C-alpha cells in the first residue's frame, strides 16, 4: 500500500475529533503535566512556517509525557484583542469582531492541518465576555485590595478603611504612591470623595497621573515596545510624552517577590538575568536637599552614599513636578523649549541615547554634607519613574554625570585616592576615600569618610543620614507600576462608573460588563476614547444595567469608564482559565486548580521577558494572595523557541533589459538583484514558467542559463512579505504532509536557536517517512510485518534509538532525534527487519514527531486504541552492549591500523594478537617492543 499522506492525515484528524482523543479531565490516579504555548494573536496574514515551531516542539513533549503515563493538559486559544484589528476597522469600517473571527477561523484551519494534540474543548478567546468576565473580576479585586509590606501580600482595602477610622495611618506600612500622614479624626472629617482620593493612594489598581507615550493619530497610549524612533510601530505616526490620568497596577509592590520567585523556577539564566535587571533592586539611601532661598526641599535616592562630598550639581527629570516649582522666570523660556523637545522621546530612547542635553533651572540646592549651593539642572537622562525623579550628580564617579559635566563645564571633584578623572569617570567601587571633606575646607558637618574603603564609607554615610534625620536607608526598585488604560475600542471594558469624578466598581454579580457597539472606532470630536461614541454606556445603579447616556443624572445613573484595558490584560491569567474554561461561578474551581496547579512547560519567545512574563507573574501572585491560585509562580519551566528566519531567493536582471542571468554567470554583466517568490524556486532552481506568470512585468522575461537551469542567489533575512520569502505551512502540508513539516521543523536545528528556513532539505525528511512506511508495506502493497523473534542486531538498533530519543526529548534536542530515527530506519531496512516486536516500539517512539503515519501503522498492527494511549518503551542496556570493540593500533603514538576484538577480551590476548598481526611487522622492524599499553575499549600503543 502506498504512503498516501493526504488520505492518512485527513482520516486521523477526523478520528481524533470524533473520538475526542485529546480531551482531558482531572484524574487523581495519574500525575498531571500541563503544557502550554504562548497563545497567538490572530492576524490577518495567518501562520507562516516560523509560527508553528514552538507549537510542534511543545506538542512532541506533550505526546511524549502522555505516553509516559501522565495526564496531559495541552490547550490552545487566542489573544484576540489588539490594535491591528482596530486599525483595520478604522480603515475599512468593518467591526473588529468580524475580522477577528475570520482570522481565528483561518488560524484554526491551519493548526488543525498540522496535527496538534490540543484539547480544543478548552479553547478561549480573550475577546469573549465569558472570558473577560474574569479579567474584570481580577481588576475589581485589585481595586479593592492594598499591599501590606509587613505581611508581604495583598489585603482587603476594607482593612485600611477600618484602621483609618481608629488610628489614622499611623504605623501603616503599605505600598503607596506617596507618603501621607493623617489622624483618625482627620480621616473622619473628610468627605467621601476626599477619602476615596486617599484610598486611591493605596489600591493595587488605582488612578494616577503618569507620563505616557501618546499617539494623537492613533488616539491612544502606546507601550514602550510599540514606539520606535519617536513614531508608532504601527503606522509610523508621531508619539509624544504626555501626562494623563490613567489606570495603573501597583506591580512595584511585588518587586521583591518577583525577584525571589526566580529562584524557584526552571528558566534560562539569561532570561532570569533580564528580569532581575528589569526589576532592578538597589540598596541605598534617600537624602533630602533644601532649595537655596526657598522653603522647598526635595529627595534624591543614591546607591553611592559615599559620594555625597563630590556632588557638584543636581539633575531633575523633565517630567518632575519640581521643574515648574524650581524654574526661575529668567530661565522659563529656555526650559519650556527643552521640555517640548523631550516630549518627543520615549523613555527607552532616552536610556539608549548617550548624547548630552540639558538646561539650567536657575535654582540651587544646598548640599547637606558640605553646605555648598549646587546648580539644579534638567536633563532627559534622568527618568521620573525611577527613584524620586531627581538625582545628585557626582561626575567624578558616574559616566553619565561625567559626560554632562564635561559638556556644560561643571566641576568634577574626585573622591578616591589616586584616581584619574581627566579623561573619564572612575566608576569602580574600590579604593580609599579622600576629599570627604576636602582638607582645604572647613568641615560643614561632623562626618569624615577620608581613609575608609568605599564599602565602609557607604555604610557609615547611610548610618549618619539615619541618625541625623537627613533621610532614610531604603531599598529601591527600577520596576514601574504598569499603565493599564488604553484609549481604544477593541479591548476589555473597565467595570467602572464615575460618581463625583471618582471611580466605583459595578457589582460583582453584574459581570461581565460587555463591550458596547459603536459606529466609529476613532476618538470622538472632543478627544474622548472611541467608547465615547457608544449611545448606551451609562450605569443604572438601581436596575444594575447599562442604559442610554442621555439618562445620566449623577444620582442613580452614572457615566461608565471610556478607556479599555491593555493587551496584556487578557494574557495575564489565561493559563488558569484553561483549567476550568466553562466555569461561570469562578475563574477556576479550587479543586481543579489544586490538581493542575501551574504550567509545567511553557513555550514562547524571549521578546516577552519584560512584558507578559513580568505581568503574568505579578497577576498570579496577586491571585495567590486572594486565594484564587494555589501556587505563586505560573510557569515552572520555560523554553524559548528561536526564530525561523526567511531564506530569500534572488534573480539577476541585466541592467536596462528584460533578461535574467543565472547566479554563477552574473559577474559577466551589470545586474540588479531582485527578490523572487521562494515558492516558485526549488533547491535554488527557478521555475521559469512560474516566474513569467508571477508578475506582469516578467511575462516577456528571457534567461541566460547555466547547464540548462536558472540558479538563484540566496540570503538569510527576516521572513516578510516584502522579501517574498514567506512560506505558508499549508503549502508544505499539501505537498509533503503534516508529519514531514513537523519533523523537518525539528530537523532544522535546536529548538532554542534561530535558524533559516530552507526547503532544500525537506525532501530528505519526506523520503525518510516513506522509507519508514516501507518497513510495513512493499511496493506491491504486500503487508510485510511478521510475528517473529527479533535478532540481536535488530534489538540493538531499536534500543539504541529509544535511549537516544528519550534523552533528546527531555533535553529538547529534537534535531538529533530526527537524525537518530533516520539512522535506525536505515539500519532496520538493511537488516530487512519486518518484525512486529521491533516495529511496534518504533511506531510508539516516532509517534510524538509524526502522529498521523504512526496512528495509521499502529492501527494496521492490530490495535484498537490510539497510539497516544500506548506506553513509552523502555530501553534495555543489555541490548546496547557491544559484542566487539574496534581498537586503534598505534606504534610510538602514531595510529597505523584498526583491529576488532571481543568486548571481553583480556589485555594479554589483545597484546598477543597485535604482535602476531602481519601488519605489525612493518612497524616493529624485528625489534622487541619496550612495552605495550592497552587502553580498554579504545587503543593499543606499541612502544618500540
Swiss-Prot record:
Motif ('KMSKS' region): 718-722
Protein's cellular compartments: Cytoplasm
GO BP terms in the entry: leucyl-tRNA aminoacylation
Principal place of residence: cytoplasm
InterPro entries: aa-tRNA-synth_I_CS, Leu-tRNA-ligase, Leu_tRNA-synth_edit, M/V/L/I-tRNA-synth_anticd-bd, Methionyl/Leucyl_tRNA_Synth, Rossmann-like_a/b/a_fold, tRNAsynth_Ia_anticodon-bd, Val/Leu/Ile-tRNA-synth_edit
Catalysis: reaction(s): tRNA(Leu) + L-leucine + ATP = L-leucyl-tRNA(Leu) + AMP + diphosphate
GO cellular component: cytosol
Known EC number: 6.1.1.4
GO MF entries: aminoacyl-tRNA deacylase activity; ATP binding; leucine-tRNA ligase activity
Top EC class of this enzyme: ligase
Keyword Transferase attributed: no
Keywords: Aminoacyl-tRNA synthetase, ATP-binding, Cytoplasm, Ligase, Nucleotide-binding, Protein biosynthesis
Binding site residues for ATP: 721
Residue numbers covered by motif 'HIGH' region: 40-51
Record PANTHER family: LEUCINE--TRNA LIGASE, MITOCHONDRIAL (PTHR43740:SF2), LEUCYL-TRNA SYNTHETASE (PTHR43740)
Family statement: Belongs to the class-I aminoacyl-tRNA synthetase family.
Official protein name in the record: Leucine--tRNA ligase
Amino acid at each position: 500500500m502506498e504512503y498516501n499522506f493526504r488520505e492518512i492525515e485527513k482520516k486521523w484528524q477526523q478520528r481524533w475529533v470524533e473520538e475526542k482523543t485529546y480531551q482531558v479531565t482531572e484524574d487523581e490516579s495519574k500525575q498531571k503535566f500541563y503544557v502550554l504555548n504562548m497563545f497567538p494573536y490572530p492576524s490577518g496574514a495567518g501562520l507562516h512556517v516560523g509560527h508553528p515551531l514552538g507549537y510542534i516542539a511543545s506538542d512532541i513533549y506533550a505526546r511524549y509525557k502522555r505516553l509516559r503515563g501522565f495526564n496531559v493538559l495541552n490547550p490552545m486559544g487566542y489573544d484576540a484583542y489588539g490594535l491591528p484589528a482596530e486599525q483595520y476597522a478604522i480603515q475599512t469600517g468593518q467591526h473588529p469582531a468580524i475580522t477577528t473571527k475570520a482570522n481565528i477561523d483561518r488560524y484554526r484551519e491551519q493548526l488543525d492541518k498540522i496535527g496538534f494534540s490540543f484539547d480544543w474543548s478548552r479553547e478561549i478567546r480573550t475577546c469573549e465576555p465569558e472570558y473577560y468576565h474574569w479579567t474584570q473580576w481580577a481588576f475589581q479585586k485589585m481595586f479593592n485590595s492594598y499591599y501590606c509590606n509587613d505581611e508581604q501580600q495583598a489585603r482587603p482595602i476594607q482593612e485600611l478603611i477600618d484602621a483609618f477610622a481608629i488610628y489614622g495611618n499611623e504605623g501603616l506600612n503599605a505600598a503607596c504612591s506617596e507618603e501621607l500622614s493623617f489622624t483618625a479624626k482627620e480621616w473622619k472629617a473628610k468627605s467621601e470623595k476626599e477619602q476615596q482620593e486617599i484610598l486611591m493612594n493605596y489600591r493595587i489598581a488605582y488612578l494616577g497621573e503618569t507620563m505616557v507615550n501618546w499617539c494623537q493619530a492613533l488616539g491612544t497610549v502606546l507601550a514602550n515596545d510599540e514606539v520606535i524612533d519617536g513614531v508608532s510601530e504601527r503606522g509610523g505616526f508621531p508619539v509624544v510624552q504626555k501626562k494623563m490620568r490613567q489606570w495603573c497596577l501597583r506591580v512595584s509592590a511585588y518587586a521583591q517577590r518577583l525577584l525571589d520567585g526566580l529562584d524557584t523556577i526552571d528558566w534560562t539564566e539569561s532570561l532570569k538575568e533580564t528580569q532581575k535587571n528589569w526589576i532592578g533592586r538597589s540598596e541605598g539611601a534617600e537624602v533630602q536637599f533644601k532649595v537655596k532661598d526657598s522653603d522647598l526641599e526635595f529627595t534624591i535616592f543614591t546607591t553611592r552614599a559615599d559620594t555625597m562630598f563630590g556632588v557638584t550639581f543636581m539633575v531633575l527629570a523633565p517630567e518632575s513636578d519640581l521643574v515648574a516649582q524650581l524654574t526661575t522666570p529668567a530661565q522659563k523660556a529656555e526650559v519650556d523649549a527643552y521640555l517640548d523637545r523631550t516630549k518627543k522621546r520615549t523613555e527607552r530612547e532616552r536610556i539608549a541615547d548617550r548624547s548630552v542635553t540639558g538646561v539650567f533651572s536657575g535654582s540651587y540646592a544646598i548640599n547637606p554634607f558640605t553646605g555648598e549651593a549646587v546648580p539644579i539642572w534638567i536633563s532627559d537622562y534622568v527618568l521620573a519613574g525611577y527613584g524620586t525623579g531627581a538625582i545628585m550628580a557626582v561626575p567624578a564617579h558616574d559616566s553619565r554625570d561625567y559626560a554632562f559635566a564635561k559638556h556644560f563645564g561643571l566641576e568634577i571633584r574626585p573622591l578616591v585616592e589616586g584616581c584619574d578623572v581627566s579623561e573619564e569617570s572612575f566608576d569602580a567601587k574600590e579604593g580609599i576615600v579622600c576629599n570627604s571633606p576636602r582638607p582645604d575646607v572647613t568641615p560643614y558637618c561632623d562626618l569624615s569618610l577620608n581613609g575608609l574603603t568605599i564599602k565602609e564609607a557607604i555604610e557609615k554615610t547611610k548610618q549618619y543620614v539615619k541618625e541625623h534625620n537627613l533621610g532614610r536607608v531604603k531599598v529601591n526598585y527600577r520596576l514601574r507600576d504598569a499603565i493599564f488604560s488604553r484609549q481604544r475600542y477593541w479591548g476589555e471594558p473597565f467595570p467602572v462608573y464615575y460618581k463625583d469624578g471618582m471611580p466605583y466598581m459595578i457589582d460583582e454579580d453584574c459581570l461581565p460588563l460587555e463591550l458596547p457597539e459603536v459606529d466609529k472606532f476613532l476618538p470622538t470630536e472632543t478627544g474622548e476614547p472611541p467608547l465615547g461614541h457608544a449611545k448606551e454606556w451609562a450605569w443604572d445603579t438601581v436596575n444594575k444595567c447599562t442604559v442610554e447616556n442621555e439618562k445620566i443624572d449623577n444620582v442613580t445613573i452614572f457615566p461608565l469608564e471610556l478607556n479599555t484595558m491593555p493587551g496584556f490584560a487578557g494574557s495575564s491569567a489565561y493559563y488558569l482559565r484553561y483549567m476550568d474554561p466553562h466555569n461561570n461561578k469562578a475563574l477556576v474551581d479550587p479543586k481543579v486548580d489544586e490538581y493542575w496547579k501551574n504550567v509545567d512547560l511553557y513555550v514562547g519567545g524571549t521578546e516577552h521577558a519584560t512584558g507578559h512574563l513580568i505581568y503574568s507573574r505579578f497577576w498570579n501572585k496577586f491571585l495567590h494572595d486572594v486565594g484564587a491560585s494555589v501556587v505563586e509562580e505560573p510557569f515552572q519551566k520555560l523554553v524559548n523557541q528561536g526564530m525561523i528566519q526567511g531564506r530569500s531567493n534572488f534573480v539577476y536582471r541585466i541592467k536596462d533589459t528584460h533578461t535574467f542571468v543565472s547566479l554563477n554567470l552574473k559577474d559577466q554583466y551589470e545586474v540588479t538583484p531582485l527578490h523572487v517568490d521562494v515558492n516558485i524556486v526549488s533547491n535554488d532552481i527557478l521555475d521559469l514558467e512560474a516566474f513569467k506568470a508571477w508578475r506582469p512585468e516578467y511575462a516577456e522575461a528571457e534567461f541566460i542559463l547555466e547547464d540548462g537551469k536558472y540558479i538563484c542567489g540566496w540570503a538569510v533575512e527576516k521572513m516578510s512579505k516584502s522579501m517574498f520569502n514567506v512560506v505558508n505551512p499549508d503549502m508544505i502540508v499539501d505537498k509533503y504532509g503534516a508529519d514531514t513539516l513537523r519533523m523537518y521543523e525539528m530537523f532544522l536545528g535546536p529548538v532554542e536557536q534561530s535558524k533559516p528556513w530552507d526547503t532544500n532539505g525537506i525532501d530528505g525528511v519526506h523520503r525518510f517517512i516513506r522509507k519508514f512506511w516501507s518497513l510495513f508495506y512493499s511496493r506491491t502493497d504486500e503487508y510485510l510485518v511478521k510475528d517473529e523473534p527479533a535478532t540481536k542486531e535488530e534489538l540493538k538498533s531499536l534500543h539504541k534509538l529509544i535511549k537516544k530519543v528519550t534523552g533528546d526529548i527531555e533535553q529538547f534536542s529534537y534535531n538529533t532525534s530526527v537524525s537518530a530515527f533516520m539512522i535506525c530506519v536505515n539500519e532496520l531496512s538493511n537488516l530487512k527487519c519486518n518484525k512486529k516486536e521491533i516495529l511496534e516500539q518504533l511506531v510508539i517512539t516516532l509517534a510524538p514527531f509524526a502522529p498521523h503515519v504512526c496512528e495509521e501503522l499502529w492501527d494496521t498492527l492490530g490495535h484498537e486504541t490510539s497510539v497516544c494511549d500506548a506506553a513509552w518503551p523502555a530501553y534495555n542496556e543489555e541490548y546496547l552492549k557491544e559484542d566487539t570493540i574496534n581498537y586503534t593500533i598505534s606504534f610510538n603514538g602514531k595510529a597505523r591500523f584498526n583491529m576488532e576484538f571481543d568486548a571481553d577480551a583480556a589485555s594479554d590476548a589483545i597484546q598477543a594478537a597485535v604482535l602476531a598481526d602481519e601488519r605489525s611487522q612493518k612497524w616493529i622492524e624485528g625489534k622487541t617492543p619496550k612495552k605495550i599499553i592497552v587502553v580498554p575499549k579504545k587503543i593499543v600503543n606499541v612502544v618500540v
